[in-house]
């Protein structure tokens, strides 16, 4: 049985942000929707687009908050509280500056590392950091003053090709996570490099 009951993809809403690095979490959710044949539908009480599906006998909920990134914790906590999903049963997919393009890693717990979506998620979950994260590497611009503009821009073609391969591997690993557990998925994904 899957330890994960809720999979969240972070991003900013609207066409303006759809292809920006900060939306890497939503990119992966869209791939999972194709892989597992589900559609996300807007659900205002959860401030997001949601789906529910059964995979290998496990009921899994998916969420893409439709709030801006810095308010995404509200959507996560609303859905988790409503369905009585514990923080350690949540996987949050997000862009990660500290990993290069072509790398994605799963980990449990930790701080927010300056990521506003994670910062709000931790706060909205009552300062509980025990949720899992699937970190999609986007690289770092090299100067902290450039980070905001960097995450709100599209990756270069070279970076996108690497990110694309990491997203493919992450899609396979989420399938493993649901069917065979988080440890097996973590071991495989954390060893991958495009």
Curated annotation (Swiss-Prot):
Positions with a binding annotation for tRNA: 17, 68, 70, 116
Chief subcellular location: cytoplasm
Subcellular location per the Swiss-Prot or TrEMBL entry: Cytoplasm
GO CC, any one term: cytoplasm
Site feature location: Discriminates between blocked and unblocked aminoacyl-tRNA: 12
Gene Ontology molecular functions: peptidyl-tRNA hydrolase activity; tRNA binding
Site feature: Stabilizes the basic form of H active site to accept a proton: 95
Keyword field: Cytoplasm, Hydrolase, RNA-binding, tRNA-binding
InterPro entries assigned to the protein according to its UniProt record, in alphabetical order: Pept_tRNA_hydro, Pept_tRNA_hydro_CS, Pept_tRNA_hydro_sf
Active site per UniProt: 22
Top-rank lineage group of the source organism: Bacteria
Oligomer and partners: Monomer.
Function: Hydrolyzes ribosome-free peptidyl-tRNAs (with 1 or more amino acids incorporated), which drop off the ribosome during protein synthesis, or as a result of ribosome stalling.
Family recorded in the similarity comment: Belongs to the PTH family.
Protein name as annotated: Peptidyl-tRNA hydrolase
UniProt gene name: pth
